[in-house]
């Protein structure tokens, strides 16, 4: 135990000999401890240095990712501009004299011969003083690939005009370099990847009894964290993550009660069948999915037309008024793993792809139509639906926490306005591919399929007028946010368009959207109990009466014509909850979807229950009525959609599915019924023919659905935060918006000029539809 070279003290009588030995040993132990402490300090300094270097590398990674994305967009822009200018020259040249034609042709040919020396000189002139040489070299290399690439045919732009949003040729290069310089200067908060994925994994496990809304809003706030909040201290990060998790578990104000518990699914059952899940951007969904552990629940936030469920193992959440809902059906994933790292579980890079490919195949960067991009790129970018305006959106790069300052500046460099991620799809307004081509290299496979009576699926060849023509919107613009203060499970718009009604926990708020600056409701209608969610609210055609239903056995009828809104009557049923409401066109009858599966029919004049349609074996979740008032359509948690003859009071048809039905809408012009599934699909059925369309742009359950009053298009919203607008019936994607949380409800104004959505972010959003 002691060193051999120690000199023991001589033994003296009357004095114990071990005293000196113990003291010396203590000194040696102290010395060794101090040595180890110094060594530990040295290692800690080295560790901090490595952590700093790692963070710096991650910053560089995000910077180059931004650069590659910007370069790719710029390359496609310049290719398209050059092609159109070339076409204009070709049209003008015949008007010149023969001599001038030859001179112009030679000048055009000379202009096409761009050498590397000229490219380097151009980049050197345009480069900013603080732009690192490596970035200039990268740009030169990238541009040289574009300059010497093979010629590729592009679909012509209608009318040959330059689409809005493409900057002039002279300013494009400087805008691109500004982005590169910005990337080199910006301080990007990039979290430790391992901790980030661990946190997301714990998020999914902790979502058994919580709605997706808290996690969605927290992710959005994480994406907006400034660089000053990023800490290199692992201890501090662990404390922050612990705090974050406590926020998930303790946020009682979010939609804890809006969960459909499907945690009893069979782990051996495939999550998604291949025929229902086309690949995205060349990566098959089934490969990209992270396999959930057997005990990992799949929680589904519900909409105003979606059934409610209390988590059965949370006594404080249990309410006798709302039954727990169970599902034995296979359930798709609810949250895709965060792309961006090659070591993410379940994300395997394809052979030959450069690192970082997975980040570029993120759902937010998908191409909605099966149109080949101008040419396949090393990054498989192609055209992106979020390209126009959504560079400022925090959801563009999932898993990469890019500061909003940099995103906004990058958008400014490209001349885009600060608005949510809508896609006017100018490139889609061209003839599309034949049905035989299901996938194009560098583009997204088809998302709309025709399913024949025998079950054969074929991609849909869209007609030339799929996205153009009278009554077809080009995009939508967010014009107002209504801060309700609770999760908004129900929305409706008055006719004429002036007021918006938002239903949350225990109350409906009325907003006047005719005044743009209005930030507070004009009235509040307290309904049900304070802790019970409103699930549906419907206005009678005269706009003077509002009917409200939710997590209670009573429906409340409000008189809005009086000086202050008052309760005119209450309708009480035997079911503990109402999930959805419909009003007959003559305003005499109200239909309510009950949690026991029955459809209650109410006489509004006499305020009595006149009939019940019985058929659904589980909760009836959604409802719509035909324009002539003769037929009723209902969807349920028993995986069926049923139609009812209102004159004869009997069931007409039943459609069976493999997934719970969360939303549906019947086309005002007749023929078509759109159905939103728990499985993330939207299916468009014909009311008499057996064939149908299946649409695959949502990544999680489809929570609400509404047809435009013209019948030419409809919108759907989902737990994936998306608002999708589709062409009736074949489902060409008209535009898409990504919100910051699950979109639980939606409505369209009677003039088809406005859309309102209700969100898990405790707000409603008003969009103006642009034609």
Swiss-Prot record:
Gene Ontology molecular-function annotations: transcription corepressor activity
InterPro entries (UniProt xref): Groucho/TLE_N, Groucho_enhance, WD40/YVTN_repeat-like_dom_sf, WD40_repeat_CS, WD40_repeat_dom_sf, WD40_rpt
Region of interest (Disordered), ranges: 137-174, 196-360
Ranges for the WD repeats: 483-521, 529-568, 573-612, 615-654, 656-695, 697-736, 738-771
Tissues expressing the protein: At gastrulation, expression is absent within the axial mesoderm. After gastrulation is complete, expressed in the presomitic mesoderm, but expression in the tailbud doesn't begin until the six to seven somite stage, after which it becomes abundant. Expression is abundant throughout somitogenesis within the posterior half of the somites, but is absent from older somites. Also expressed in a dynamic manner within the neural plate.
Region of interest (Q domain), residue spans: 1-141
GO cellular component annotations of the record: nucleus; transcription regulator complex
Stretches for region CcN domain: 210-278
CDD domains, sorted: WD40
Origin: domain of life: Eukaryota
UniProt cross-references to PANTHER family, sorted A to Z: TRANSDUCIN-LIKE ENHANCER PROTEIN, TRANSDUCIN-LIKE ENHANCER PROTEIN 3
Similarity comment: Belongs to the WD repeat Groucho/TLE family.
UniProt name for this protein: Transducin-like enhancer protein 3-B
Protein encoded by which gene: tle3b
